[in-house]
């Protein structure tokens, strides 16, 4: 056996530098983050040959005291923390005291700095971690660090560098991310003598987004914001036009620290999934402000990964915040005819005109849209109905509040029902007149100089999905007893997933018993599903749960199961009567998210008369 050797400081620092300094952009990131911690308002970064020949970072921050400059190059010397407990209350980017000694050990470095209280600054020069000179220097308040000949003494590292242009691109990317995180700081990036980025430092995030991504991006993003006692989430998400085949345009910041997080990415993408073009990823810039004690930033050498103390709470909060923002944005974009205050107006009309809800004749239901399993409760008021024009309670906003008096509802009960369903009664789409059906697949309708094309299968899928999902959340799912129970023998992994999610199956309408080792007996299934293939349905649910991972909340799992309820929807090429089409569109109008099916495909397309006139060359 070989003898154990104690490494010398030079060798140790070079090895440690391999973790902190992967490539030139790592140097830029560490130095710029130091400038941010110094409360600089202007930061200039200059690079040559992809950072291999030169990296220069200048700032107007607080500066370093003369007697601290040499200390700054000692391993684990830092002004950010005193003990391990301070890591859990960090408000700075750096804290380990590793950056400067690591960089100095593999390059030639010149640092000069002057705090406001001093009349002159100090300049220190080092090569390969060795002190060469330490002198006085005249300069403005702030710090300038010049790194040259990176990796000159570890030539093996040079072989792993990419081309100069690629390394420059990585540097540009990290400066852009830091600019987004700090819109109150003016950043300038100079690459090979040419200024390639220059932000305003106005404090306005939209200004930074415009400089980095352009005017078109700024015009296609929506703001979101939500707060709780321990966490705040805010930022911007792009519409489908900005979606791309990679995640390059996704930025996540936790307490202003740029990180990569599969948890946050999954939360945003799941929220966007119903509106997302298939196989493309949304643009987003998301900020999460959370008490430092709820995160651990000391889990990765480059500090680009963190751990959340309550990851499921964070996932759920981000998911709900982003999803609600997208939903509101789509309503506004798709249907400008629906006013933002329609909900309040509806309440006032109901309050001021109680006589509207008296002596209303029974509304007939001539069809079930081939989904008799849709057991719609009385209090949903409107779903799957066809109303004779004389039986409709009309108001001057949405003309779509219906009441069936068969049960002789008391006035108090009626008020309670109306109160509970005010949101459901607000139409998300305008009133439409049926034109016909194309190819027994698409419903054609018109409204106020707009042509609407509705995918009947996608629309009915969304209606079934929302109905089933709402019933799950309200514990109102009804089950149907199977004439002959189904016995499934599972492998040990699938059986374990079932046991771990037993409550999930119960709440979604399944009655399942353990029937021996790795074997289950399915006695009841959700009534809304009609007559599905039970074996495949159960395995689909198990596979979905497997794919989700531990970060997904129970609500997302409910949504995933609800998608499987859509198989009883009307299909393409099913011929529908005019009454069936009217009922389907009416249900879609009152859906919570009517624009996309559960799988992300659009349910409805709007073509304006202006677009048609352009197509026919009637106007230019």
From Swiss-Prot:
Top-level taxon of origin: Bacteria
Its biological function? This protein is involved in the repair of mismatches in DNA. It is required for dam-dependent methyl-directed DNA mismatch repair. May act as a 'molecular matchmaker', a protein that promotes the formation of a stable complex between two or more DNA-binding proteins in an ATP-dependent manner without itself being part of a final effector complex.
Q: Where are the transmembrane segments?
A: none
The UniProt similarity line reads:
Belongs to the DNA mismatch repair MutL/HexB family.
Instruction: Identify the keywords attached in UniProt to this record, alphabetized.
Output: DNA damage, DNA repair
NCBIfam families according to UniProt: mutl (TIGR00585)
**Protein's UniProt name:** DNA mismatch repair protein MutL
A single Gene Ontology CC term: mismatch repair complex
Query: Has the keyword DNA damage been applied to this entry?
Result: yes
* Keyword field contains DNA damage: yes
Q: Which GO terms describe its molecular function?
A: ATP binding; ATP hydrolysis activity; ATP-dependent DNA damage sensor activity; mismatched DNA binding
Gene3D superfamilies linked: 3.30.230.10, Histidine kinase-like ATPase, C-terminal domain, MutL, C-terminal domain, dimerisation subdomain, MutL, C-terminal domain, regulatory subdomain
Q: Which GO terms describe its biological process?
A: mismatch repair
């Amino acid at each position: 056996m070989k003898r154990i050797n104690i490494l010398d400081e030079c060798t140790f620092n070079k090895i440690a530098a391999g973790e902190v300094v992967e490539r030139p952009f790592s140097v830029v990131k560490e130095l710029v983050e130091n400038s941010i911690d110094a409360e600089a308002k202007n930061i200039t970064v200059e690079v040559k040959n992809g950072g291999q020949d030169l990296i220069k970072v200048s700032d107007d921050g607080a500066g370093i005291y003369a007697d601290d400059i040499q200390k700054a190059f000692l391993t684990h010397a830092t002004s950010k923390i005193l003990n391990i407990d301070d890591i859990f209350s960090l408000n700075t980017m750096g804290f380990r005291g590793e950056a400067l000694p690591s960089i100095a050990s593999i390059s030639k470095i010149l640092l000069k700095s002057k705090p406001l209280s001093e009349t002159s600054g100090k300049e220190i020069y080092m090569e390969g971690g060795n002190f060469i000179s330490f002198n006085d220097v005249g300069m403005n308040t702030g710090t300038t660090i010049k790194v040259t000949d990176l990796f000159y003494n570890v030539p093996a590292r040079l072989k792993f560098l990419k081309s100069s242009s690629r390394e420059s691109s990585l540097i540009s990317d990290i400066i852009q991310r830091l600019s987004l995180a700090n819109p109150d700081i003016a950043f300038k990036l100079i690459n090979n003598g040419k200024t390639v980025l220059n932000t305003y430092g106005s404090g306005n995030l939209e200004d930074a987004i415009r400089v980095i991504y352009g005017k078109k991006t700024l015009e296609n993003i929506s703001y979101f914001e939500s707060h709780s006692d321990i966490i705040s989430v805010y930022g911007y998400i792009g519409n489908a036009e900005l979606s791309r085949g990679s995640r390059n345009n996704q930025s996540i910041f936790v307490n202003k620290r740029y990180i990569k997080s599969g948890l946050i990415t999954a939360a945003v993408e799941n929220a966007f999934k119903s509106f997302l073009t298939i196989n493309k990823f949304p643009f987003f810039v998301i900020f999460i402000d959370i008490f430092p004690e709820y995160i651990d930033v000391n889990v990765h050498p480059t500090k680009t990964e963190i751990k959340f103390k309550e990851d499921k709470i964070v996932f759920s909060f981000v998911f709900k915040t982003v999803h609600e923002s997208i939903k509101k944005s789509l309503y506004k974009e798709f249907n400008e005819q629906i006013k933002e205050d329609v909900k309040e107006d509806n309440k006032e009309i109901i309050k001021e005109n109680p006589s509207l809800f008296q002596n209303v004749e029974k509304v007939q239901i001539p069809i079930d849209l081939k989904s008799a399993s849709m057991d719609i409760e009385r209090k949903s008021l409107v779903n799957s109905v066809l109303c004779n024009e004389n039986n409709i309670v009309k108001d001057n906003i949405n003309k779509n509040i219906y009441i069936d008096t068969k049960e002789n509802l008391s006035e108090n009960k009626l008020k309670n029902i109306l109160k509970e369903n005010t949101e459901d009664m607000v139409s998300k789409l305008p009133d439409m007149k049926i034109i016909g059906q194309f190819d027994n697949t698409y419903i054609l309708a018109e409204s106020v100089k707009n042509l609407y094309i509705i995918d009947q299968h996608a629309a009915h899928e969304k209606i079934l999905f929302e109905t089933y999902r709402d019933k799950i959340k309200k514990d109102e799912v009804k089950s149907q007893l199977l004439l002959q129970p189904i016995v499934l023998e599972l492998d040990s992994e699938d059986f374990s997933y079932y046991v771990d999610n037993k409550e999930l199956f119960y709440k979604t309408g399944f009655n399942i018993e353990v029937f021996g080792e790795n074997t289950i007996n399915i006695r009841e299934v959700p009534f809304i599903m009609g007559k599905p293939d039970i074996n495949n349905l159960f395995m689909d649910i198990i596979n979905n749960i497997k794919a989700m991972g531990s970060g997904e909340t129970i609500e997302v799992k409910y949504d995933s199961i609800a998608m499987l309820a859509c198989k009883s929807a009307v299909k393409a090429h099913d011929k529908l009567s005019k009454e069936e089409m009217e009922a389907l569109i009416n249900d879609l109008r009152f859906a919570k998210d009517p624009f996309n099916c559960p799988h992300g495909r659009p349910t409805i397309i709007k073509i304006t008369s202006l677009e048609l006139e352009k197509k026919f060359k009637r106007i230019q």
